[in-house]
Regions:
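Flexible, acidic/His-enriched mid-domain "rim/lid" segments that flank
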Residues: 1-76, 81-87, 93-99, 106, ...
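Compact, glycine/acidic-enriched structural inserts
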Residues: 105-117
Length: 169
């Protein structure tokens, strides 16, 4: 952009939201679980592997911001994007408290189990405040700017790393 004579400008607001006033709602929820024979491992097995990885990296939790990684971990699929079978959500996995999907509960309801909680993304700062001295692993290069600002403002200790599920997937 700069080489072509353009200018980069940082905006704190989503410019699309400011212009797209008649944006259609998401399609009706169509979440489902992948059968274990297709998924390869259960959520419990994947969670145990993730907890061991985080422990080895001296982290208490990880914020998963890759939609494909969250869907893979939970063995779920959905209809939130045309031609891409995913549920749009992030996840916070804590070694002690388990998995919390950060998204719309009504859309995620079909895949929820007793070992999965769900909260709106707006509750993330409060959840991070409860971490104490535990370190949060984040994939800084893929973290939305607004979310990064909220994490930094929460005072939680962070550890930057690639998504721990990328190789496993």
């Amino acid at each position: 952009v700069l080489a072509a004579g353009g200018t980069l400008v940082c905006h704190n607001e989503n410019l699309l939201d400011q212009q797209w006033h008649d944006r259609p709602a998401l399609p009706p929820a169509a979440s489902w679980r992948m059968p274990i024979e297709n998924a390869g491992k259960s959520l419990a097995e994947k969670s145990a592997d993730l907890a061991a990885y985080l422990d080895a990296k001296d982290c208490a939790a990880v914020l998963l911001t890759r939609v494909d990684s969250v869907n893979w971990l939970v063995n779920m699929r959905g209809g939130d994007l045309p031609c891409t079978p995913v549920n749009l959500c992030f996840a916070l996995y804590h070694c002690e408290t388990g998995l919390c999907l950060l998204g719309d509960q009504s859309r995620l309801q079909p895949v929820l189990t007793p070992d999965i909680t769900v909260a709106p993304l707006t509750q993330l700062p409060a959840m991070l405040g409860d971490m104490g001295d535990g370190r949060l692993m984040i994939e800084a290069a893929r973290l939305p700017k607004r979310l990064c600002e909220r994490i930094m403002a929460s005072g939680v200790h962070t550890s930057a790393a690639d998504c721990p599920l990328s190789i496993e997937k």
